[in-house]
């Protein structure tokens, strides 16, 4: 009977997730995942993007109360903008809450001034993430008071669909954007494993409002997908025979060891990575002359690697039959105990 686990174990799996933050801010990151089976880059990228933009918990202002103002079609004495414009500006305020319960923030300023989000008294449990965001223009000797209710939620909730029931007279519900992720884009490129060059590389660009770091947002989105998909697994996994038959291989199992598991200097490791040398089998097929032609790879790096290969009774310039095997990642996992 065909092993059920072969359905997922035989597939190529990503080696790691690489995060690269942009120098101007920690709220933007480039995330690279490789290698993936062909088609999986688009599948995972689209699923992650949808979850990131719709399902993460965040905080937002859900209602406001301005003395003597009962609805959004009013005007505020001394304020250049009408109430609907002020509400639109308030929707752009990004907040972070350190508690799950709702909090009420206070705003009290006297003109003339440009009123910004940083002037709001948030207390200890709420943090304004964009304090320079403009709320309105206040005229000279005029005063503006406002109470702003902040809550935790997810997604985008219209004021007409607000879960705020029985708001007091004069308190105005506003549209609330809870999602801490501002934008997600992705693209899929080809990447190489051994001699095969048509695997997928998923590259995602994630920007948050500062409530979460992009790395955390991606991790939470992956966990949400994991929880949702778990229900579809409706079978019991079979016990696999853990006996590894090393004599079935036409080459040494040490060739299946990944070069990033070797204790190499950073310079040597980067040279191998840039030259797409993944496994020791890829490495020993190269000659010393081949290696010295690799950019930034010198005699010192060559001698370092020769010493490590000698520990496994291996050398450069070896003739390895049937390399690379089609199921190289599965073999590497199966024979892991043999070379560790």
From Swiss-Prot:
<dbReference type="InterPro" id="IPR011260">
    <property type="entry name" value="RNAP_asu_C"/>
</dbReference>
<keyword id="KW-0240">DNA-directed RNA polymerase</keyword>
<dbReference type="Pfam" id="PF01000">
    <property type="entry name" value="RNA_pol_A_bac"/>
</dbReference>
<dbReference type="InterPro" id="IPR011263">
    <property type="entry name" value="DNA-dir_RNA_pol_RpoA/D/Rpb3"/>
</dbReference>
<dbReference type="GO" id="GO:0006351">
    <property type="term" value="P:DNA-templated transcription"/>
</dbReference>
<keyword id="KW-0808">Transferase</keyword>
<feature type="region of interest" description="Alpha N-terminal domain (alpha-NTD)">
    <location>
        <begin position="1"/>
        <end position="236"/>
    </location>
</feature>
<keyword id="KW-0548">Nucleotidyltransferase</keyword>
<dbReference type="GO" id="GO:0046983">
    <property type="term" value="F:protein dimerization activity"/>
</dbReference>
<dbReference type="InterPro" id="IPR036643">
    <property type="entry name" value="RNApol_insert_sf"/>
</dbReference>
<comment type="function">
    <text>DNA-dependent RNA polymerase catalyzes the transcription of DNA into RNA using the four ribonucleoside triphosphates as substrates.</text>
</comment>
<feature type="region of interest" description="Alpha C-terminal domain (alpha-CTD)">
    <location>
        <begin position="251"/>
        <end position="340"/>
    </location>
</feature>
<protein>
    <recommendedName>
        <fullName>DNA-directed RNA polymerase subunit alpha</fullName>
        <ecNumber>2.7.7.6</ecNumber>
    </recommendedName>
</protein>
<dbReference type="GO" id="GO:0000428">
    <property type="term" value="C:DNA-directed RNA polymerase complex"/>
</dbReference>
<dbReference type="InterPro" id="IPR036603">
    <property type="entry name" value="RBP11-like"/>
</dbReference>
<dbReference type="Pfam" id="PF03118">
    <property type="entry name" value="RNA_pol_A_CTD"/>
</dbReference>
<dbReference type="GO" id="GO:0005737">
    <property type="term" value="C:cytoplasm"/>
</dbReference>
<dbReference type="InterPro" id="IPR011773">
    <property type="entry name" value="DNA-dir_RpoA"/>
</dbReference>
<dbReference type="GO" id="GO:0003899">
    <property type="term" value="F:DNA-directed RNA polymerase activity"/>
</dbReference>
<dbReference type="GO" id="GO:0003677">
    <property type="term" value="F:DNA binding"/>
</dbReference>
<comment type="subunit">
    <text>Homodimer. The RNAP catalytic core consists of 2 alpha, 1 beta, 1 beta' and 1 omega subunit. When a sigma factor is associated with the core the holoenzyme is formed, which can initiate transcription.</text>
</comment>
<comment type="similarity">
    <text>Belongs to the RNA polymerase alpha chain family.</text>
</comment>
<dbReference type="Pfam" id="PF01193">
    <property type="entry name" value="RNA_pol_L"/>
</dbReference>
<keyword id="KW-0804">Transcription</keyword>
<dbReference type="InterPro" id="IPR011262">
    <property type="entry name" value="DNA-dir_RNA_pol_insert"/>
</dbReference>
